[in-house]
Amino acid sequence: MLKPLGDRVVVQLKEEKEQTVGGFVLAGASQEKTKKAQVVAVGEGVRTLTGELVASSLVQGDTILIENHVGTPVKDDGKDCLIIREADVLAVVND
């Protein structure tokens, strides 16, 4: 299992259903510019200039919303994941 450093977060993308309109699959450019992911692991947080640790506001299991272009793809226990910075998280989704 990966242990992210600092403000980094390991996430696994959630499968999204294909968007259709009247039975036609929408082209990639027409689809959402965001995607949902589940938090797999969270770094310890970041340090301020005075050395104080500011912990992450995310916890393992959170469902989050991120932009399509963020993250570094990695494999974790054979699963496709992304490593992102906490600042790249747009929102926490309450299911």
UniProtKB/Swiss-Prot annotation:
Record's GO cellular component terms: cytoplasm
Subcellular localization(s) per the UniProt record: Cytoplasm
PROSITE patterns in UniProt: CHAPERONINS_CPN10
Pfam families in the record: Cpn10
Biological process according to GO: chaperone cofactor-dependent protein refolding
GO terms of molecular function: ATP binding; metal ion binding; protein folding chaperone; protein-folding chaperone binding; unfolded protein binding
Keywords tagged on the record: Chaperone, Cytoplasm
Coiled-coil portions: none
InterPro entries per UniProt: Chaperonin_GroES, Chaperonin_GroES_sf, Chaprnonin_Cpn10_CS, GroES-like_sf
Function, as annotated: Together with the chaperonin GroEL, plays an essential role in assisting protein folding. The GroEL-GroES system forms a nano-cage that allows encapsulation of the non-native substrate proteins and provides a physical environment optimized to promote and accelerate protein folding. GroES binds to the apical surface of the GroEL ring, thereby capping the opening of the GroEL channel.
Xref: PANTHER family: 10 KDA HEAT SHOCK PROTEIN (PTHR10772), CO-CHAPERONIN GROES (PTHR10772:SF58)
Record text on subunit structure and interactions: Heptamer of 7 subunits arranged in a ring. Interacts with the chaperonin GroEL.
Family, per entry: Belongs to the GroES chaperonin family.
Name of the protein in question: Co-chaperonin GroES
Organism: Streptococcus mutans serotype c (strain ATCC 700610 / UA159)
